[in-house]
């Protein structure tokens, strides 16, 4: 509260690792769900979106609550948020498997990226997504936090330049 009063234009973000919108909305600043308590977090992380899109990527949208219907059903609860436009959406981060897991499914990434970037959320891109970095936590945290390829003379490849990227990247 004091931080918001002293610096009203400063944004605070909370990693609310719950996978249902009602639980996430509870933590956003001025939520009626948590009244009279107030977390004062202006931005909460949408782990529900993360969970739904990572489940949907392996499903067909054939029946209710599968595939993109699963993602859509996440957004119908936006009315629970005091400020849905100040919710942070992501498809992967440093604590999760990479969106591509251990694969390199470009069409899947091409479907998820526009949704992430155009939804009524603050999009968060984890470094390496743009060059299709993959990895799973079951191997280790370090496997999903590998160094970005490039930037140092000792790097075998340099994805910071077009010449250092593969055709698919």
Feature roles, as predicted:
Residues 97-101:
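Surface-exposed cleft-lining segments at the edges of enzyme active sites
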Residues 1-82, 87, 104-106, 114-118, ...:
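Active-site-proximal helices and loops of the catalytic beta/alpha 8
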């Amino acid at each position: 509260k004091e931080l918001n009063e002293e610096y009203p234009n400063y944004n605070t973000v909370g990693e609310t690792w719950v996978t249902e919108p009602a639980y996430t909305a509870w933590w956003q600043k001025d939520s009626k769900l948590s009244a009279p308590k107030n977390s004062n977090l202006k931005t909460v992380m949408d782990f529900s979106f993360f969970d739904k899109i990572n489940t949907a990527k392996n499903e067909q949208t054939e029946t209710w609550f599968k595939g993109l219907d699963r993602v859509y059903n996440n957004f119908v609860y936006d009315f629970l948020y005091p400020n849905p436009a100040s919710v942070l959406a992501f498809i992967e981060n440093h604590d999760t498997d990479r969106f591509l897991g251990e694969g390199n499914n470009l069409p899947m990434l091409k479907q998820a990226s526009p949704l992430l970037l155009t939804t009524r959320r603050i999009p968060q891109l984890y470094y390496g997504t743009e060059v299709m970095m993959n990895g799973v936590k079951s191997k280790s945290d370090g496997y999903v936090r590998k160094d970005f390829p490039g930037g140092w003379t000792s790097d075998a490849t340099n994805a910071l330049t077009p010449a250092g990227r593969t055709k698919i990247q």
